[in-house]
Design a protein with these regions (language model features):
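Intrinsically disordered, low-complexity terminal regions
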Residues: 2-249
């Protein structure tokens, strides 16, 4: 029988100043996207990558392939304002550097109210044979059905969300620092760490890990629908709560 150690620290009041740029997405007012992405001409040349960093308003759809293709496709078809779409094409850059693809803007861009909703925003389709890091800094969303990697790091820093159906990784690190949320339906591997520091929440459906550590330090919550594994350690120093259903067999 596997042994399980569970440690829950008492919650204490946690107050921290947060610098968040609100874009009023979905409102009737004009919002603004800001960017200061730096690059060289060589950075714009397509190269293999294992990490993704998105710092803008967009919906990102990632697909892992079993070949050697690394590609990024920008789809502007959902944007109904032709003038805004053209300005976005001029400002957006896809930078390939140090094994990472970074997508962002080179300056400020006002977003019309009609382009604020998710259904009318830019769609980004990304594929690669391997993925070791996801960084979401913008207001958009990141979606993936399945990711299989030796290690995977998820860093959600903005207002947006990360939603992944299935992750298989020897080591999985999830950091949620902003207002957005991280949702994983199934996670399986050896070691997993969840660090929830912001206002948002982290939810994992079924977790099968040899070792899982949860640190909840912000206002948001962490939910584990079902944990099965060796060791589970929970530290709750924030205002939010941590809830977990555990298989002790």
């Amino acid at each position: 029988m596997k042994t399980m150690s569970i440690w829950v620290a008492s919650a204490t009041l946690f107050l921290a100043s947060m610098g968040i740029c609100s874009c009023s997405m979905g409102s009737t007012t004009t919002s603004e996207m800001r960017g200061s992405l730096e690059f060289t001409q060589d950075d714009l040349r397509e190269k293999p990558f294992k990490a993704i960093d998105v710092d803008m308003v967009a919906s990102v759809y990632y697909t892992q392939n079993d070949g050697d293709e690394c590609s990024v496709r920008l789809d502007y078809s959902a944007i109904k304002d032709a003038e805004f779409a053209q300005k976005l094409k001029e400002k957006i850059k896809v930078v390939y550097r140090d094994g990472e693809v970074k997508i962002g803007l080179t300056g400020r861009l006002k977003v019309p109210a009609m382009c604020n909703s998710e259904k009318n925003r830019l769609k980004i389709y990304i594929t690669s044979p391997d993925l070791v890091k996801i960084t979401q800094e913008g207001v958009g969303a990141f979606y993936a059905k399945s990711i299989n990697s030796d290690r995977l790091e998820i860093d959600n820093e903005g207002v947006g969300s990360v939603s992944i159906n299935k992750i298989l990784a020897n080591r999985l690190d999830v950091t949620n620092e902003g207002v957005g949320s991280v949702s994983i339906e199934h996670a399986k591997g050896d070691v997993m760490k969840i660090d929830n520091e912001g206002v948002g929440s982290v939810k994992v459906g079924n977790v099968a890990m040899g070792d899982l550590k949860v640190d909840n330090e912000g206002v948001g919550s962490v939910t584990l629908d079902f944990f099965k594994g060796g060791n589970l350690k929970i530290n709750n120093d924030g205002v939010g709560k941590v809830s977990a259903k555990v298989d002790c067999q």
